[in-house]
Amino acid sequence: MIDTVKLRLNYTESPTFNVGQYLDNSKSNMNTDTGELWGSGTLRNMHVFYNGGGIVVEGSIGGFLFPNNSRIPKRQDVGTAIEQLSDLLHLPMSNALVVRLDCGYHWNMERPANHYFPLLCEATYFERLNQTSTTLKYAKGGKKETNVLIFYDKAKECKDKGKPLLDGFGENVLRYECRWMSRVSRQFGLGQLTASILTNEDFYHSMVKRWGDFYESINKSFRGDYDMPLMGNVRLANDFIYSILLNLQDAGVVIDIEKTMKDSNVFGEKGWQYDNLRRSIINRRAKVEQYASYGLTDELNDKVRDVVNNCE
């Protein structure tokens, strides 16, 4: 589940420590007055930056450990990666502060990945930023992006990088990631989140639960059949019609209704009306969605919930 990490280790007691000697593609400089070294390089797939105050290591755990990055690292694999980094760099990387953390999973799906993007609508606390033929992204925190949720076509990514998928994966592979981009320790309610904590069972389970909770916070649309006998409490024809029409729209189209009206200054100084509009759209869509067969949405919901419920 844990994929990309960014680790920072301070070692102010040794400003002349030459990390570059252990790196590939090493580029270094030295302060001739103090002997302080700084530079960069790579270690397998990891990018390494260092100076007299410390070292920053960033990259994919899966890419570091395995020749094929479609293999999903387990909790124990993270511990192995930290141990290997410590040995290769001759530094106690288990003490490093985690300043970025990505958690993700990918699945074989019934349909191509981009068929699921239109079913994922607005999300609590997140802005739905962009949807392309291969990627859907949500972000929180404005320009600083403290958190990012991303759904993308894993099969195409592997193909573009010239790395075949593992046996068992077909052409329709969808990946969902949650990325904690900043203030990671604070977001998890910890004074300091160090690399050694990443393999702690309680922490790991809480991380996977947050990954699942963020997914659940996304409102879903659908294409489906309706169980008409159960719809007796939908009293108004307009409620049914509006809900069906809204659910037939792509998620981005629904969200753009509010933006279009804001750009046109429809409500003038009555800015609170836009919040009412958004709530009205969500409520009308929800009127009949509980009676629908979700199809692709059900499939994705089940995939995510299965990972959360069976986390090891």
Model regions and ranges:
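Short, solvent-exposed alpha-helical "recognition" segments
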Residues: 283-299
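Structured, helix-rich domain cores that form ligand/interaction pockets
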Residues: 1-257, 304-312
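Helix-turn-helix DNA-binding segment
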Residues: 266, 275-286
